Amino acid sequence: MAIYGIGTDLAQVSRIAAVLERTGGRFAEKVLGPDELRVFHARRARSEARGIAFLATRFSAKEAFSKAIGLGMHWPMTWRALQTLNRPSGEPYVVASGGLAEWLDARGITARVTVSDERDYAVTFVVAEAPDDVVAARSGAAS
């Protein structure tokens, strides 16, 4: 396995809060996958700030992932096709669905993700990995 790509994103929590307020909550439904949306609602019910911070980290994760795989936010990379969930230990991991899952599987791409947030910002770093021949073909190098 070799590094296919890396991506990072920094989201301003207040900007995410403003968009959520302006859209009457529709922003969360547009951006979050079903499992993420459940966590968002649960966290927001306990604390508005925790809900907004969660949304900011997930928005940031999708942006960083789209950069790591080199597609940006273009098909098959869509907001809801990628979810960042947490293992019981708290470790974040990504789950792709639909066309994105097929695209990743066809290339053997896997990813590692880390997310962090403070009061004002959420940051994500993603490392996408793929078999050596896929990375070599992408970079134009001979196998």
Swiss-Prot record:
Keyword set, alphabetical order: Cytoplasm, Fatty acid biosynthesis, Fatty acid metabolism, Lipid biosynthesis, Lipid metabolism, Magnesium, Metal-binding, Transferase
Coiled-coil stretches noted in the UniProt entry, renumbered to this chain: none
Subcellular location: Cytoplasm
Any one Gene Ontology molecular-function term assigned to this protein's record: magnesium ion binding
EC number assigned by the record: 2.7.8.7
Superkingdom of this protein's organism: Bacteria
Gene3D superfamilies the record matches: 4'-phosphopantetheinyl transferase domain
Purpose: Transfers the 4'-phosphopantetheine moiety from coenzyme A to a Ser of acyl-carrier-protein.
Name used for this protein in its record: Holo-[acyl-carrier-protein] synthase
